[in-house]
Amino acid sequence: MTPEQPYIGYKSTFGKKDKHRIVLIPWFTDFLSPLIPALAQLAGYKFVNCPKTSKTSAEIGLRYGNNEVCYPATLVLGDLIAELQTGKYDLDNVAVAITQTGGQCRATNYLGMIKQGLKNAGFECVPTIAVTLGGGVHQNEQKGFKLPIMKILNIGVNALFFGDALFQMFSAAIVREKSTGETQKFFDFYLEKAKEITLENKPQKLLSLMEQAVNDFNSIEIVDKKLQKVGLIGEIFVKYNNYGQVHITEWLRAHNCEVLVPPMTSFFLQSFVNQQINRENGIKRTNILTLKLLPLLYKFLDKRQKKFEKRLEKSHFFHPHESIFKLAQYAKEILDLSNQFGEGWLIAGEVANFARQGVNRIVCIQPFGCIANHIVAKGIERRLKQHYPDLNLLFLDIDGGMAEVNLHNRLHFLIDE
């Protein structure tokens, strides 16, 4: 392959004439995926969520992919191919899209694997888009796909904070509700309202909706019972995708555990710490414009996050979460902050944050063979326990061929001690 002879293994591209195409996206998580098509519509694209990840996704992903890759990639590929195989879409008017961060792990190779999988399944004619939010990630750039970041920034930020806050209230209420289904009813209702507001591009209305949601979740009649608190951390996809995590969260709730999951916003905000650390350590150069803009952008995001937290504090089971720089401070006691592959130092920071709040039972999940997260998760177990002796850490590798009974047995050891 040379500049004169570019790679032509997958010929379909998304050009300017293709903006009319329906863009299929894999299901990620219940509190954010429903809002993504609305954000995309504001940006001028028609995104459609695939159905929630299922056993069919895993089987199809393995059939057309490679079982040596990251398990989430197998599920993502399976989601996309399964939906294309339904026959609901004109292949001349459809494309697929996935997100890319450009990190130092197998996830960076999703694109190549998904293109090969689509080709194996007979969908080589379907263009593949990589959705990124900048940061120097240049993968699979397509002339017809450009996100108007400034147009959707305000509403996008509020949608993410809203989803995080809604999920926190949902997680606290569903394990305590007296009338089964009431919590889910409110969760679905407010996600639907959030979709409507997102389409209107009214960021301030999401704050008002948050206040209303807090009042309604507080009105749920609860059962007064003793619950164990269990923290759930790990790789972003298996942490937030119900099938990807083998429904661990549901299993724990069924065994009288309140599952505490860190907000997804932390995953994105850690880049502000990373930029600073990389500059200080001479790992990456930062131009003067970026140096000036980064603190302003963080200040904007932090101020917006605090507005949502102020409203969330009024919920009955509010669980505070520290700022990303405070988490970095905690993590620095455990490992060098230059460890940024996989979830990076964020895992150490989240474990420390839970431990300082008295949550000592923690499940850390990652895809089987995820070397990046093994290093920054299980690799720091001894040091974590030196700092926090009361910790009870359980590390679980998730894979399509794992026996769920073995996983449940290990979870019993965590909660039955």
Ranges and model annotations:
Residues 1-417:
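An N-terminal assembly and electron-transfer interface module characteristic of large anaerobic redox
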